[in-house]
A protein has these predicted regions:
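Non-catalytic, solvent-exposed segments at the cell envelope interface
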Residues: 1-326, 335-337
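Flexible helix-coil linker/hinge segments at domain or subdomain boundaries
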Residues: 328-330
């Protein structure tokens, strides 16, 4: 699937999404650029049909944390002379598996085998009569598992729940930070993120208020020792020199519609958005952050957000990452008009 592009990708996204993300959305690896899971799932299902000719009833995604939740119910999984438990399987599939398998195809087969063994245990009754509930409930509520149905009536019900991952409700969340690996490497498991969203004072003569977003990223990747296929810089020209363990993160800042950009800095150096547009009823600005191994960088965005006095309570969405994200919302006083 990775080798093919979806020919008619524009049919599955909005015109705003097409303009913001472009034909990157046609590639499987980039079908998660939007934080709106139904958008991503429609693209994935369409690509699978293009490749195989078969339609699917739905799309289910899990990450390493969901796998750990499941293994907590199934019990340990034996793989490649290792005993993987709920305590170590997340680190294994995001880091250690690359040491066991230098060949990326063999690595992919190993990870798929782990997932298959886990689901086979669940189907076999591991965890007792409520095993599936115990395995699925935690990731469904933490964002580690997402579900989409091709049947519109079923999808309508799913999209109203947390597991649906829909951004149709503009009141929840009001803002979001989306990280995308712009280098095309395997270093996400070494990236930690902390986000602070703060509301400031209300404007006296206009229906706006000050607002700020602070995003700090740390790259904890080692400077040596990782397999070459973990550390490439596919964003750079062929033959370009770069530090092993370095990466580039694309930061998409989603804020309430009508917000006006004021200024931004990366490590206190002024920057402007690389791109801007709209996605699921929110204003979006993109910033690119270069990170050397064992380094950090801070993006600070100042903007004006609409404040007419009837806005929803501010909330912030961040995606599930291998390293837990620290997210803080500082709510300002309600503006009176």
């Amino acid at each position: 699937i990775n080798l093919q592009s979806l020919a008619n990708w524009r049919e599955y996204v909005t015109s705003d999404q097409a303009q913001l993300y472009g034909d990157d959305l046609s590639r499987f690896a980039d079908m998660n650029l939007s934080p709106d899971f139904p958008t991503n799932a429609r693209l994935m299902a369409a690509l699978l049909k293009q490749v195989t000719g078969k339609s699917v009833d739905g799309v289910l995604t899990i990450n390493q944390n969901a796998l750990a939740d499941m293994v907590a119910v199934t019990g340990p999984i034996a793989q490649n002379h290792r005993i993987l438990t709920s305590e170590n399987i997340a680190d294994y599939v995001t880091k250690d598996v690359y040491s066991d398998f230098k060949n990326p195809k063999e690595k992919n087969i190993a990870v798929l085998s782990l997932i298959q063994k886990t689901f086979d245990k669940l189907k076999g009754g591991a965890g007792g009569p409520f095993g599936l509930v115990r395995a699925f409930a935690p990731p469904m509520h933490t964002g580690s598992m997402m579900l989409w149905a091709s049947d519109k009536s079923i999808e309508k019900k799913i999209s109203s729940t947390h597991v649906g991952g829909s951004f149709d409700n503009l009141s929840n969340p009001t803002s979001a930070i989306v990280l995308v690996n712009g280098a095309g490497n395997k270093l996400d498991s070494y990236i930690s993120e902390s986000v602070q969203y703060s509301q400031g004072i209300c404007s006296i003569d206009a229906p706006y208020r000050d607002a700020y977003l602070r995003v700090k990223l740390e790259n904890n990747a080692p400077e040596s020792g990782l397999p070459n296929y973990v550390t490439p810089r596919n964003d750079l020209p062929v033959g370009a020199n770069y530090k092993a363990g370095s990466t580039r993160m694309l930061v998409y800042v989603h804020v309430p519609l009508g917000s006006e950009f004021e200024s931004a800095t990366i490590n206190e150096k002024k920057v402007i958005p690389i791109a801007e547009g709209f996605d699921t009823g929110r204003q979006v600005w993109r910033f690119d952050i270069e990170l050397d191994p064992q380094s950090d960088a801070t993006l600070f965005v100042s903007f004006q957000e609409v404040a007419e006095g009837n806005e929803p309570t501010p909330s912030l969405w961040t995606q599930s990452m291998p390293i837990d994200t620290s997210a803080v919302v500082e709510k300002g006083q309600r503006c009176v008009r």
